[in-house]
């Protein structure tokens, strides 16, 4: 049986949450706040990439081939996750929005995209924590106990 280690994802979530708290506590418009905003945007990207790597590993446990998964678009991976009960369809739709935002911020670090990313943070943190919990429960070292 394949076991997933979600510790790296949990660490990314912790770091992203801390960056968001520091951003919110910083003086409005300060350089410090801008630094924390940038940390939130990068943390958002890293947390997503870590989650998608884990999803690929999880989908292998459901019989999907590694080579095929490596070439499968992210949105299709998310749909597959729903088919296997790792996410709900509503969660998949929200993850589509997170992915679209991440793709936009990767090409344009403008303030508008950063503010959109910040707006998504509360829901994203809730969804990624839930995903980590599902993966840990279903495929983690303690799964099935």
Residue ranges and their predicted role:
Residues 1-145:
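Solvent-exposed interaction patches of small proteins and small membrane subunits
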